[in-house]
Amino acid sequence: MLQPHLVIGSAFTFGDAFFTLFAFAILLVLIRIYAWKPLMGVMKEREEHIGSEIDAAEESRAQAEQLLAEQKSVLQQARVESQTMIENAKQLGEKEREEIVKTARRESERIKEEAKTDIAREKEDAISALREQVGSLSVLIASKVIEKNLDEKEQSNLIQDYIERLGDDK
């Protein structure tokens, strides 16, 4: 049959409560020794592992940010260098253009001066030839007028005299 202390609804006794409390305390001590400490060790290892993974991820992120900043710096420096090269090329091109223009102007001035010199020389040659022709024609006309032939010396003196008068008239 049933024993009275096992029946539901039986009376509560202090001994049963003390025994239950003592058994529960022993169970807690055993759980703490054999289950809780290993479980806490595993949890602590897991926490440390997750912490180290987070630290590694943060370090990787910091390295990635540093690398990104370095790449941005290198890219900016390359942009500045390329802009400087472009500006230098523009300035060099402008200087070369100015030098070419100066050289062309000097050459045109030189050609112009040569042309002026050539024109002046040709003018002098033409005037000289014209004077000689005028002198010869004058002598020829004069000799026909006076109907006598002049010798070479008289002709030369007459031409020289006529040329000097012609030069004085101008």
UniProtKB/Swiss-Prot annotation:
Summary of subunit composition and partner proteins: F-type ATPases have 2 components, F(1) - the catalytic core - and F(0) - the membrane proton channel. F(1) has five subunits: alpha(3), beta(3), gamma(1), delta(1), epsilon(1). F(0) has three main subunits: a(1), b(2) and c(10-14). The alpha and beta chains form an alternating ring which encloses part of the gamma chain. F(1) is attached to F(0) by a central stalk formed by the gamma and epsilon chains, while a peripheral stalk is formed by the delta and b chains.
Name of the molecule in the record: ATP synthase subunit b
Keywords assigned: ATP synthesis, Cell membrane, CF(0), Hydrogen ion transport, Ion transport, Membrane, Transmembrane, Transmembrane helix, Transport
Membrane topology according to the record: Single-pass membrane protein
Database matches in SUPFAM superfamilies: F1F0 ATP synthase subunit B, membrane domain
Family assignment from sequence similarity: Belongs to the ATPase B chain family.
Source organism: Listeria welshimeri serovar 6b (strain ATCC 35897 / DSM 20650 / CCUG 15529 / CIP 8149 / NCTC 11857 / SLCC 5334 / V8)
Transmembrane regions listed in the UniProt entry: 11-31
Molecular function via GO: proton-transporting ATP synthase activity, rotational mechanism; proton-transporting ATPase activity, rotational mechanism
